[in-house]
């Protein structure tokens, strides 16, 4: 029986994902599978290529013929070179970048929220009303200080008068 290593399309529309499978050469693309070797997700950056190296080399050694795209993937992972005894059998697939855990993202957002908003979102009317309220509060504070100063002056003047009257007696 002629056996091929093919890509079997799975996934949604416009989101291609493939399984790297071993099938009978005459089987249709979505047909019966002898063995599933791995996955290929080209939509991710960088692409995800995860192929079981040991099983891929076994099937190549037994005589399974890869399709052109499957051959390109097997060359990237180095499985084709290892099975055929060629040089350059190292895996050249770029590793996926480390994702932040949800706990780290949550803690960063919590720390940012604790610092408070970085900019105020205030309309023009509210800004003017806020400035007027601050000016009014400042004017009231000044009036209160003047009243206290005048009361202190009166108290000092009365104390001076009492001391003069006491010394005159």
Swiss-Prot record:
A single GO cellular-component term on record: cytoplasm
Keyword Ribonucleoprotein: yes
Acidic residues compositional bias, start-end: 159-169
GO BP terms in the entry: translation
The keyword Ribonucleoprotein is assigned to this record: yes
Pfam families: Ribosomal_S16 (PF00886)
Family: Belongs to the bacterial ribosomal protein bS16 family.
Name under which the protein is recorded: Small ribosomal subunit protein bS16
UniProt source species: Corynebacterium urealyticum (strain ATCC 43042 / DSM 7109)
């Amino acid at each position: 029986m002629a056996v091929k290593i093919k890509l079997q399309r799975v996934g949604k529309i416009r989101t291609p994902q493939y399984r790297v499978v071993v099938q009978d050469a005459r089987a249709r693309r979505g047909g019966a599978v002898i063995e599933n070797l791995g996955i290929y997700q080209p939509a991710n950056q960088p692409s995800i290529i995860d192929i079981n190296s040991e099983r891929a080399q076994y099937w190549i050694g037994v005589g399974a013929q890869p399709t052109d795209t499957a051959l390109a993937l097997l060359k990237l992972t180095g499985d084709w070179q290892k099975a055929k005894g060629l040089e350059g059998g190292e895996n050249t697939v770029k590793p996926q970048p480390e994702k932040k855990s949800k706990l780290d993202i949550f803690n960063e957002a919590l720390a940012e929220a604790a610092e408070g908003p970085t900019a105020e979102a205030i309309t023009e009317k509210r800004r003017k009303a806020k400035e007027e309220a601050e000016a009014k509060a400042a004017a009231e504070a000044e009036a209160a200080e003047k009243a206290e100063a005048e009361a202190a002056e009166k108290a000092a003047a009365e104390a001076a008068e009492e001391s003069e009257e006491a010394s005159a007696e």
